Amino acid sequence: MDQAIYTLHEFMLHTKNWTYILMGVTLLVYVGYWLFLTGRDEKIRKY
């Protein structure tokens, strides 16, 4: 962060932006992990 935050409004916008970025990254990681876990299942053999 190379510029100063002078008002509460600027601070709130900055933290809100980072919150949305982190939420998006967390969602992508969660979906990737879920696909990794469910992709390892073997097919059920029907005799």
From Swiss-Prot:
Membrane spanning residue stretches: 18-37
Entry's localization field: Cell membrane
Keywords carried by this UniProt record: Cell membrane, Membrane, Transmembrane, Transmembrane helix
Membrane topology reported for the UniProt record: Single-pass membrane protein
Signal peptide (residue range): none
InterPro entries recorded: sulf_resp_HmcD
Cellular component GO terms, alphabetical: plasma membrane
Domain of life the protein comes from: Bacteria
Function: HMWC (high-molecular-weight cytochrome c), ORF2, ORF3, ORF4, ORF5 and ORF6 in the HMC operon form a transmembrane protein complex that allows electron flow from the periplasmic hydrogenase to the cytoplasmic enzymes that catalyze reduction of sulfates.
Protein name as annotated: Protein DVU_0533
Organism: Nitratidesulfovibrio vulgaris (strain ATCC 29579 / DSM 644 / CCUG 34227 / NCIMB 8303 / VKM B-1760 / Hildenborough)
